[in-house]
Every structure is written in structure tokens, then in C-alpha cells.
């Protein structure tokens, strides 16, 4: 095998490797989930991104407010809700209890 054949083989291997690595990069999804979008759109905005890799830093490519944009993701919810914020709890914070009007006690007298 001559040196020119060896050079062609090496260049081909490098190109195939670069293309394969680039394909893998595009499939990588950044951590977190896209924030909820409750906006009703009459017209979509042009996309600012197509994949998470189009966005800088921790930002993800999400459909938000009528178009794809790079936004800061929210934490993923664990099964049963997020430990930091349980929206299913009827009270504003753990340990909160209703107080009787004009009393510091949590027990109200029965009528």
C-alpha cells in the first residue's frame, strides 16, 4: 500500500469518526424538563432553536409562548411530585394549621 493510499484511508476514517460523533451529540438531551406552556397561540413564532445543542449553557430548546426558544429548564418532577414543592398539599407550607379567629390555639370550641 502506497503512502497516498494510506493518507486517503486515514482521512476517510477521520471524516467518518467526526460525522458519527456529531450525530451522537445531536441526540444528547440536557437535564431538566421544559416549563409548562399554557399560552394559546393564534400564530407561531419562527423557531430560535431546533435541539438542546442549539442553546448555550444549561438552556433547553422548548416550545414556549408560541415558538421554540432556549429557556432555563425546570427540575424534573419525581413520582408523586417534587420534594421541594408539593402542589397537592392544601396548606401553604408543612406544619401550617388553621387558627381559630381571635385565638392562638389550633383547636376551636365546638358550637
From Swiss-Prot:
Biased composition (Polar residues): 102-111
Domain of life (superkingdom): Eukaryota
Domain WAP: start-end pairs: 27-74
Gene Ontology MF terms: serine-type endopeptidase inhibitor activity
A Pfam family reported for this protein in Swiss-Prot or TrEMBL: WAP
Tissue expression profile of the protein: Highly expressed in prostate, skin, lung and esophagus. Weakly expressed in skeletal muscle, epididymis, kidney, trachea, salivary gland, testis and seminal vesicle.
Entry's localization field: Secreted
SUPFAM superfamilies: Elafin-like
SMART domains: WAP
Broad class of where this protein is predominantly found: secreted
Assigned keywords, A-Z: Antibiotic, Antimicrobial, Disulfide bond, Protease inhibitor, Secreted, Serine protease inhibitor, Signal
Alphabetical GO biological process terms: antibacterial humoral response; defense response to bacterium; innate immune response
Gene Ontology CC entries for this record: extracellular space
Disulfide bonds: 34-62, 41-66, 49-61, 55-70
InterPro entries xref list: Elafin-like_sf, WAP_dom
Signal peptide: 1-23
Ranges where the record places region Disordered: 80-111
Function: Antibacterial protein. Putative acid-stable proteinase inhibitor.
Protein name as it appears in the record: WAP four-disulfide core domain protein 12
Organism lineage string: Eukaryota, Metazoa, Chordata, Craniata, Vertebrata
Amino acid at each position: 500500500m502506497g503512502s497516498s493510499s494510506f493518507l486517503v484511508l486515514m482521512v476517510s476514517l477521520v471524516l467518518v469518526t467526526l460525522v458519527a460523533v456529531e450525530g451522537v451529540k445531536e441526540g444528547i438531551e440536557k437535564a431538566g424538563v421544559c416549563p409548562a406552556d399554557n399560552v394559546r397561540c393564534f400564530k407561531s413564532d419562527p423557531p430560535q432553536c431546533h435541539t438542546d445543542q442549539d442553546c448555550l449553557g444549561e438552556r433547553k430548546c422548548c416550545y414556549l409562548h408560541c415558538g421554540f426558544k432556549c429557556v432555563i429548564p425546570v427540575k424534573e418532577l419525581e413520582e408523586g411530585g417534587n420534594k421541594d414543592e408539593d402542589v397537592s398539599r392544601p396548606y401553604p407550607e408543612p406544619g401550617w394549621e388553621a387558627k381559630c379567629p381571635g385565638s392562638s390555639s389550633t383547636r376551636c370550641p365546638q358550637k
